[in-house]
C-alpha cells in the first residue's frame, strides 16, 4: 500500500528517484516494473506497479469498443500507458509525452494512493489540495453511504 505525498525531483533526462521506503516493495511485488498513464480527470499521471496495472487492463478489456464513452476511456488510458523499469539506482524514466501532459518539469509530488501513485507538478498539487479542502468545507450535497460510514 502506498500512502503519503513526497516531493521528488526529475533529472534532466526526465527520471525520478523513487523514495527508498517504496523501492523494496516495488522490487518484491513488481520486480521494479511500472506502468505510467494519464489521469483522465486531473492534470496528473498515474503510476502503477505492473501487477496492479494488469488488473486495470483486464477491466478495460471488458469495456465495449462499440460504446463511445467506454472506447474513449480505453483509448486515453491504454493509448498513453507507458512501461517504465526502475533502474539499479531506483529511478524511473517518465516518457516525455506524459511529462508534458501533466506539466511536469523539475519538482514533482509523488502521492501514494493505495495501489498506485499520482504524479503532480508541485504547484498544481498544492492548488488541487486547496481546491479539495475548500470544496469539502462548503459541501452542500449529501455524502454517499460509504463516506457516511467513514469514521476518522
From Swiss-Prot:
SUPFAM superfamilies: AbrB/MazE/MraZ-like (SSF89447)
An annotated Gene Ontology molecular function: DNA-binding transcription factor activity
Alphabetical list of InterPro entries matching this protein: MraZ, MraZ_C, MraZ_dom, MraZ_N, MraZ_sf, SpoVT-AbrB_dom, SpoVT-AbrB_sf
The organism's place on the tree of life at top rank: Bacteria
Pfam families: MraZ
Record keywords: Cytoplasm, DNA-binding, Repeat, Repressor, Transcription, Transcription regulation
PROSITE patterns per the UniProt record, alphabetical: SPOVT_ABRB
One CC-aspect GO term: cytoplasm
Coiled coil: none
Record-stated family: Belongs to the MraZ family.
PANTHER family: TRANSCRIPTIONAL REGULATOR MRAZ (PTHR34701:SF1)
Role of this protein: Negatively regulates its own expression and that of the subsequent genes in the proximal part of the division and cell wall (dcw) gene cluster. Acts by binding directly to DNA. May also regulate the expression of genes outside the dcw cluster.
Designated name of the protein: Transcriptional regulator MraZ
Amino acid at each position: 500500500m502506498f500512502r503519503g505525498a513526497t516531493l521528488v525531483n526529475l533529472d534532466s533526462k526526465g527520471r525520478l528517484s523513487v523514495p527508498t521506503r517504496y523501492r523494496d516493495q516495488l522490487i518484491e511485488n513488481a520486480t521494479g516494473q511500472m506502468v505510467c498513464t494519464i489521469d483522465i480527470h486531473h492534470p496528473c499521471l498515474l503510476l502503477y506497479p505492473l501487477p496492479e496495472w494488469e488488473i486495470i487492463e483486464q477491466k478495460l478489456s471488458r469495456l465495449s469498443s462499440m460504446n463511445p464513452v467506454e472506447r474513449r476511456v480505453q483509448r486515453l488510458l491504454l493509448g498513453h500507458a507507458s512501461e517504465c523499469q526502475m533502474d539499479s539506482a531506483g529511478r524511473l524514466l517518465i516518457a516525455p509525452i506524459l511529462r508534458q501532459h501533466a506539466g511536469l518539469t523539475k519538482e514533482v509530488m509523488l502521492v501514494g494512493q493505495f495501489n498506485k501513485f499520482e504524479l503532480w507538478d508541485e504547484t498544481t498539487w498544492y492548488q488541487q489540495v486547496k481546491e479539495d479542502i475548500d470544496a469539502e468545507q462548503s459541501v452542500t450535497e449529501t455524502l454517499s453511504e460509504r463516506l457516511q460510514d467513514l469514521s476518522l
